[in-house]
Amino acid sequence: MTLLITGDSIVSAEAVWDHATMANRELAFKAGDVIKVLDASNKDWWWGQIDDEEGWFPASFVRLWVNQEDEVEEGPSDVQNGHLDPNSDCLCLGRPLQNRDQMRANVINEIMSTERHYIKHLKDICEGYLKQCRKRRDMFSDEQLKVIFGNIEDIYRFQMGFVRDLEKQYNNDDPHLSEIGPCFLEHQDGFWIYSEYCNNHLDACMELSKLMKDSRYQHFFEACRLLQQMIDIAIDGFLLTPVQKICKYPLQLAELLKYTAQDHSDYRYVAAALAVMRNVTQQINERKRRLENIDKIAQWQASVLDWEGEDILDRSSELIYTGEMAWIYQPYGRNQQRVFFLFDHQMVLCKKDLIRRDILYYKGRIDMDKYEVVDIEDGRDDDFNVSMKNAFKLHNKETEEIHLFFAKKLEEKIRWLRAFREERKMVQEDEKIGFEISENQKRQAAMTVRKVPKQKGVNSARSVPPSYPPPQDPLNHGQYLVPDGIAQSQVFEFTEPKRSQSPFWQNFSRYCEGIKKPNRSKRVSDYDDAGVDFCSGNILHSGCFFYHWGFPCCSTAGSLQFCI
């Protein structure tokens, strides 16, 4: 290492841990940053550079790159001619390796070394922290420990078996001949347990943050670290290790494939392992994103009026597709226009408000686990006795119930059919890895919705909970439905598009002017300007109380009264 630096070679290291510091002469960095090592004469503290910043940093916080690019002359202190000692936790660099086999040996040895080092970290977490926490029932409940540590013990057991198989495939005499690709393929299903841990990690950090406000917990965790003789890193740093580890596998396998000849017996296995691990990390990231978006689903549900039944988050975590279609539920039934929201496991049916088209009313849901999608050719359907175009069915095999849907265009029908296939695929993948939203995450989403301040103005109804009462006639109730700060003309322009008035309604309006205003309380004048023609969208004259089909009606913003 020293020979590389003194020989004007560039020695690069990758940060494994975050190093936050306020000291002037220390170098701050985050995990994943690349550091140029300038001085390694001290075994514990090295001098390095990131961009234009230089400073001291802990040597244990970084991992040297396997293959340094610059060449140096061989010296007496070279260790294993540039090989990484698999029995140590650090990389021993000597004379640079000049052929593919030697380069591959470097990568193999690094993988073995980091796996052994990682196993030690998992053991320290399970025995140094979790085991001690379970002894203190006065400080930790079972639920708290589940949130903080997640399924770390399952990961520890899995990694022990994985490393045992790696050891069997490792060729200690000629590391480049090792065939470790099959190990990743044999254990590919086991890596999915990281999904649960990664999804829970944010909750773990939040719970730890609350506990650390109490000095008792600070002292307890520090005592656990010292008792287990762990390096000087806080517990949240140790708990971050599995998240970092699962993201490192594709990088390591890509490096291994780079230095593996195509005629090597391990080449096709490494290539397949790389594809598998990339898929695992991609899916884990996708599920992490889904959990981060559950607050939006909870907020959407709160905006839907007249909600009934269980919450969306009780079964679903992703909105897959949404659109408006015509729908018939039973033979000879009436064609109804509905807005459909397809989630995993269920599809929610809503109806738009007649005036406020941005307001939705809950009208039911369909359990997608019980239905199959049936594509239908254009023509006439004998069961429903209707002509069909751009249609498809949802058929319940158990009850023989059928829902018939009509898309406006063929392209829209194709998108719906594709969305249904995606929904089934997502459900199957979630069942495979055991993905679900924890009760704690559901509570957090519900709390977030309650904390969102209700908006004022045109969109105020979108914040009203499902128990929103039916609209009331402002002439019979002493309250406004239109906020004082908004011009009513603006409100109605928003809710009803402008259109030319027919001669019938012009004559009708003149007829209304001749009708004597009913005798009401003195405060009626306060609400006279709230009247609106529900067909034309025009605001009526002050004091105009018009009649429709012989029955008095009054329409206001967001509250349309059909007195029929």
UniProtKB/Swiss-Prot annotation:
Keyword vocabulary terms for this entry: Cytoplasm, Guanine-nucleotide releasing factor, Phosphoprotein, SH3 domain, Synapse
Residue numbers carrying Phosphoserine: S502
PROSITE patterns: DH_2 (PS50010), PH_DOMAIN (PS50003), SH3 (PS50002)
CDD domains reported for this sequence: PH_Collybistin_ASEF, RhoGEF, SH3_ARHGEF9
One Gene Ontology molecular-function label: guanyl-nucleotide exchange factor activity
Cellular component terms per the entry's GO annotation: cytosol; postsynaptic density
Ranges for domain DH: 103-287
Xref: SUPFAM superfamilies: DBL homology domain (DH-domain), PH domain-like, SH3-domain
Positions of region (Disordered): 451-470
A Pfam entry, by short name: SH3_1
SMART domains (alphabetical): PH, RhoGEF, SH3
Residues annotated as domain PH: 318-425
The SH3 domain, residue ranges: 8-67
Residue segments, region Interaction with GPHN: 100-110
Subcellular location: Cytoplasm; Postsynaptic density
Stated role: Acts as a guanine nucleotide exchange factor (GEF) for CDC42. Promotes formation of GPHN clusters.
Subunit structure: Interacts with GPHN.
Full protein name: Rho guanine nucleotide exchange factor 9
Lineage: Eukaryota, Metazoa, Chordata, Craniata, Vertebrata
Record gene name: ARHGEF9
